[in-house]
Amino acid sequence: YLAAKAKERVTGFNIGDVIDLLDKAIEKCGTNMNAEAAAYVLERINWRLRLAQYTEAIADYDLYYTLIGGQVLPNFFFLREQAKFRAGDLEGALKDIQAAIQGSPSTPDYYAEEASIYVRQQKYEDALKSIERAIAIAPDFGACYRLRGVCCVRLKKKTEAFEAFNKAKELGDPLAGKLIKEHCK
């Protein structure tokens, strides 16, 4: 592990070499994997995500979950959801973000993330429900208004889409103006 940390400090280091060293640190823990091994697994997850190795990162998230006996915070499920989403596992991502919501129902970002999964699944009515929950918690969440507008466009509700995009723009969303020009003219 210390060799991996030292390797990170070398200019122009190879991330693959760091992952290999972390693999060895985890292997050294053998069958007695514990909190120490869990820390190494978390480190390896971060590097795998940097290399867009989402499937491997998901496997490491699962290993980490097992190593610590499932004692995780809601943010764990959010982070694993992000990897699953990027890997194209939308059902797995949805289950994880819903676990995050269950653990922290007052976090608007989790509802927004749930909505974005529903949009990818073309479940626009479900997405709108999630968006409404996020906005109820954080009324100035501009990205949610943008997402509401996208759902309304897909549902052929042009007036509602314009209103949502306009609210997003008013709240400073950087993409809202472009979406208004693209979908509401």
Can you say where each PLM-predicted feature lies in the sequence?
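Register position in tetratricopeptide repeats
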Residues: 9-11, 50, 86, 120, ...
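Canonical positions in the second alpha-helix
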Residues: 25, 64, 99-100, 133-134, ...
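Terminal, low-structured helical/coil segments at or just beyond the last alpha-helical repeat
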Residues: 159-185
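Structural marker of alpha-solenoid helical repeat scaffolds
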Residues: 28, 32, 67-69, 103, ...
